[in-house]
Amino acid sequence: KSSAASDVYKRQILCVPYTDLFYAWHTTEGTNIHIGAENMHWEEKGAYTGEVSGQMLKSIGVEYVIIGHSERREYFAETDETVNKKIKSALAHGLKPIVCVGETLEQREAGETEKVVTNQIAKAFEGIEASDLEKIIVAYEPIWAIGTGKTATSEDANNSCLLYTSDA
């Protein structure tokens, strides 16, 4: 791998709440730390009280945005379709999406990890240009390991990464 390619894997990204974005950007200016938002809305304009668009994020120096986090999916009823809209909007505004995928404990115990993660990736990336795939980071988020005392192994993460690589 070239040094440029390997640098991507060493990038430090700090994703903070909206209220801390400008402060984080200002504080880390001139460092190797990149700033990301924890969420965004896919529409650029409209009556979406409390939502922040990709254009707004970009205007204050944000480079990355988390999309599809399990908490957003669970508590705010985000779907694979809304994740797809957010990815497209992020890319259109020059942001680099960090797309979360992962399975619940029930899905894991039923042996459905591959099916669930593959489906999430396929729906999230529907209509995304191949040239844009390199701008997207996929984060394996094993939902079953959050607050359960169970931990994902490096093999779990590697297997999910292989699913992404083969789908892409």
Label each PLM-derived region with a short phrase:
Residues 43-49:
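Short, charged, surface-exposed secondary-structure boundary motifs
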Residues 28-35, 61-64, 96:
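Glycine-enriched alpha-helix->loop->beta-strand junction motifs that scaffold or abut catalytic
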Residues 1-5, 9, 164-168:
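Single conserved hydrophobic/aromatic residue that forms the stacking wall/gate
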Residues 2-3, 31, 53, 70:
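Short linear Ser/Thr-Pro motifs
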